[in-house]
Amino acid sequence: MTMLGLVLVMGTLSMGNFVSGQQTLDLKTPGGNEAFGGDNKGSVLLVPKEHSVNIVANMDTPPKEGKTFEGWLADVGGSAYKLSLGEFSKNGTLDYAGMMVNPYTYTQFVVTEEPFEDTDPNGASVVAGAELVSPFGQ
């Protein structure tokens, strides 16, 4: 009985570090009174768990000829840092899984339209995005 109590207490303590908050958000164009108050262009699913995050994003329309979509996590209002999550596949999907020291500092998921085989590490203009909700934005 004592061992079971110890396991329950340890399990409770370790749960204190667990942060979860799966969210599915619409990807919208910039505009309106909000950062992304325009037309719906796709969706993004974010599944954070402690120091890992899985992201699946889908764009409803293809990029322009000679262009490709790229996904980013952005720390808007903080460091202004943008982390590239890579290029969307030809079917319009981005599938990202990674370990991060603090994924919750990011406040937006954005999509840019980049030249195909782009060598510039900076992002082009944002074509769609979403404001992240808690536990993000900490």
Briefly describe each language-model feature range.
Residues M1-Q138:
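N-terminal targeting/export leaders
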